[in-house]
Every structure is written in C-alpha cells, then in structure tokens.
A protein has these predicted regions:
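Extreme N-terminal leader/targeting segments of oxidoreductases
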Residues: 1-33, 51-52, 56-57, 83
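Flavin (FAD/FMN) cofactor-binding and adjacent substrate-gating region
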Residues: 2-7, 14, 84-88, 112-193
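Internal hydrophobic alpha-helix adjacent to the cofactor/substrate pocket in enzyme cavities
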Residues: 46, 50, 384-404
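Glycine-rich FAD pyrophosphate-binding loop
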Residues: 50-73
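Glycine-rich active-site loop/strand segments that organize a redox cofactor
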Residues: 73-102
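Active-site substrate-recognition segment that forms the wall
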Residues: 76-78, 116-124, 210, 227-267, ...
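Short beta-strand to alpha-helix junction loop
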Residues: 98-107, 131-140, 177-196, 205, ...
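Helical element adjacent to the flavin cofactor pocket in flavoenzyme catalytic cores
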Residues: 146-147, 173-231
Length: 439
C-alpha cells in the first residue's frame, strides 16, 4: 500500500516550535466513529461530528504529524472564492456561485476558530492580489474581472506602478486586488492549532499510517502497532484514497513545489520595498508563480510541478524546483542579485494535490458505514474545511443550503489509469512550464 511519503522537510512546519509528543494507535480501539486523515477536511469533520454528538467517542487518525502533510504544505491562502480567468464566461454560473459560497463558508469557519482559540498562525485578512507579467496574464486578468463581476465580488484593477507599491517589484505589468475574501496564514501552524483544540470527545492519533483497511460493518483500520474498529468510517484522505481502494479513477496526483527563505533583515526589506506587513500574490497565467511575503519577512515562492506522491521526496525534483525558485525571486527583485550568498532559501518542499478533470468532488456515503470527502483540486483549505463540516452534518441528518450547494458539485469524471494518466499529466505540466514566461 502506498502511504504518505513526504520529504523530511516542510518549511512552514520547520519554522514552528517542536510539537508535544504524539499519541499513536496501540492495541485495539473500538469506537462508533473514526475519521481517517487529519488534514483540514478531517480536522473539520471530526470537530463538527463531535459537536453534533457530544456523548460519542470519535477517533481521528493521521499518518504523520498534524500540519506536516499536504494541508500544511500549501502557500497559506484561505481562498473565499477560486476560479481561473480562462474559465470566463462561466459555462455553469450557478455551480461557480455554489463553489464560492462553499469556499466563503469554510473561510468563515476557519477565521472564527483561529480567533476563538487564539491559534498563532499569522492569520492576516489581507485578501489576494492576482498578478500578470505579460500578455497571457493580462488576458487572463480580463477574464477574472468579468468573473468577479458575475459573482458580485468587488475587485480593483491595479497598474504596474500600483502593483510595485505592494510588492516592491517592477516585474509585474498589472494586478487585480480582491479584498476581504482571503486569509493568509502559516498552514502548518493553523493545522496544528486546530488539532490541539479539538473537542474533548475527539482523540487524535498521529504517526499512525493505516497499512490495511478491512471495509465492512464495522470497518477495521490496521496500523503497525494496533487497530481501530469503528461502525462509521469517514474518509478524508484525498489523493491517498486510491491506496485504500477508493477513487482510483478520479484524480491526478500533482505535486507543487515551494521554497521559503530566511527572514530578511531590516536593510534587505528596505532595499526591496513593498508592503512589509506581508502580501499574497496569485498568478493570472497558468504556470506562473504564487508568491507570499510573510509578516516575519520571508519570501515564499511556489512553482514547478511533479507527478505522484513519490515526487514530494524526489531529491532531483526538489533541486530543480529550488533552482527555479531562486531564478523567480531574482526576476522579481533584481536588487538581490547575490541571492545565494545573501537571502538564501532555507526550505524547499513539495505537496501533492488531487486534481479532477471537471473540478468534481467525491462527497457523501460511499457504501454502508463509509462516508467520504475526497478531491481538493488545489484549493482545499477553505473548501476542505467546509466539506468536512458538511459531511458530518450529512451523517447526523442535518440539512442546509450549503449542504445543497455541496451536493450540486458533480462527481469527478473518469480518468484512465497509469501509465497513460501519468504520461498525459507530465506532458501537460511540461508544456505549461515551458510556455509560461511569468514564472
């Protein structure tokens, strides 16, 4: 069975203090409910289920440490809406609006949890800035403007000089700022905080990868040192679901790479200028770079792609991505020409996304006693949080407009198996990387 095999580094996680010792599955544990996967979806599902069923014992199992895996490896955007400019005009405006409501719901849940539990993750309601650095991006920005108008969301167009005021970079030709719909944070810190503040009737087990799953009523989840037997299993395993026998033809496992620099000195921050409180940039062009400047003065650069969970720990792919990130930072801030000798990269890592053909989602009852929320499509922090809460609502029989929105999202379209899937995916990723002058 293919288990999570992330590289032994995650920049967001590595800058945190050491966590408390992990509790691991040991012996036989018998419970009514088990949630598998403690990313944002599983954390949300376990919390919501525990709130609905305060007298029931719920187990949450994570293969690694909470925050170290996929949910702690993204760029740190909690997107209250997400679409591509190339998708405008929308083929199905009602479905796009449903996606936006679901994302906004997840954003609101997380913002409240971070505030109520005083989770230290650098949360900043900064919004997001779509940026362009050429003709492809400019055309896509026009589509984004139309899309936000369709959704009734305010967005302000920025020229090159206005973008430079924010970023300290003359690399960009235009931008589109969307206020109030995106939180910025350290995803590993946020996930750890969510795991540390779960309701008292949730028991979290970490470093407990499930080596074998015996489906049934009850289901039996077997780890190296024990087993969990549960009447109800909630699968929140995303791209690792095929290893457990689910969603084998639903997703492409795409690895996105990121690097995080050391904190800039006051002199370096003054040298590049821009908003010293931090910002978040999303590329308008496909294959462009996602960029963060953190409150402590680090630069995060995210671009370059791989295929399959194994590529998160592929040393050659990590080295290639790191070189690309250095080049991308130099393009944006040429004053840092001595980058390798000065503002060095401290961490480079990969995170694997589950991408479907049609932005579809596996949601609901998979079979008797087994439920699932699977398929992130690269925007999982807010949507995963919302879908996790909604799967718990569905299990206990609660209904809502948001649950109806979630149920309106189609199932993923069928994908061919490897090696065909891998071959096509690699060709498309290579073409996208070569075509983008905006990386």
């Amino acid at each position: 069975m293919q288990l999570p095999n992330n590289a032994a580094t995650n920049g967001w996680y590595n800058v945190l203090p050491d966590p408390s010792p992990a509790k691991q599955v040991s012996g036989t544990i018998r419970v009514p409910y088990v949630v598998l996967g403690a990313g944002v979806t599983g954390l949300s599902a376990a919390r919501q289920l525990a709130t609905h069923l305060p007298d029931e014992e719920i187990v949450l199992i994570e293969a690694e440490r909470v925050g170290f895996g996929t949910s702690g490896r993204n760029s740190g955007f909690v997107l209250g809406n997400h679409f591509h400019g190339g998708d405008v005009p929308f083929e199905n405006p009602a479905l796009v609006a449903a996606h936006a409501r679901l994302s906004r719901g997840g954003l609101n849940i997380l913002r409240k949890l971070v505030t109520d539990h005083e989770i230290e993750c650098g949360w900043h309601d900064w919004g997001k800035l779509h940026v362009s650095a050429g003709a492809e991006g400019d055309a896509t920005l026009n589509g984004l403007v139309q899309g936000y108008e369709t959704l009734g969301i305010q967005a302000k167009e920025l020229d090159a000089d206005e973008v430079a005021v924010v970023t300290g970079s003359s690399f960009y030709t235009a931008g589109l700022k969307v206020e109030g719909t995106t939180g910025l944070m350290n995803p590993a810190a946020m996930c750890r905080g969510l795991g540390e503040t779960l309701p008292s009737n949730v028991t979290l087990y970490e470093i407990s990868p499930v080596h074998r799953l015996e489906r049934g009523q009850p289901s039996r989840l077997i780890t190296a040192n024990g087993e969990v037997i549960a009447d109800h299993l909630i699968m929140c395993t995303n791209i690792f679901s095929p290893a457990l026998g689910f969603s084998k033809s639903d997703m492409v496992p795409v690895v996105a790479y990121a690097s995080l620099t050391r904190p800039m000195t006051a002199l370096e921050q003054a040298e590049i200028g821009g908003d010293a409180n931090g910002f978040g940039l999303l590329p308008a062009a496909h294959g462009g770079s996602t960029v963060r400047r953190t409150p402590d003065g680090r630069i995060l650069m995210r671009n370059s792609f791989g295929y399959g969970p194994g590529d998160t720990s592929n040393s050659a792919m990590l080295a290639r991505a790191r070189a690309n990130h250095i080049e991308s930072i130099k393009k944006r801030w040429p004053k840092l020409q001595d980058f390798e000798m000065g503002l060095e990269i401290e961490h480079t890592w990969g995170g694997v996304l589950g991408v479907t053909r049609n932005s579809g989602h596996v949601f609901g009852q998979i079979e008797k006693g087994i439920w699932g929320s699977i398929g992130c499509n690269g925007a999982n922090v807010a949507r995963g949080t919302m879908s996790g809460a909604l799967i718990a609502d569905m299990i206990v029989g609660n209904t809502s407009d948001l649950l109806s929105d979630q149920q309106s999202v189609p199932r993923p379209k069928w994908m061919p198996p490897d090696p065909f899937r891998k071959m096509v995916a690699r060709q498309r990723m290579k073409k996208m990387e070569k075509a983008s002058a905006e990386r």
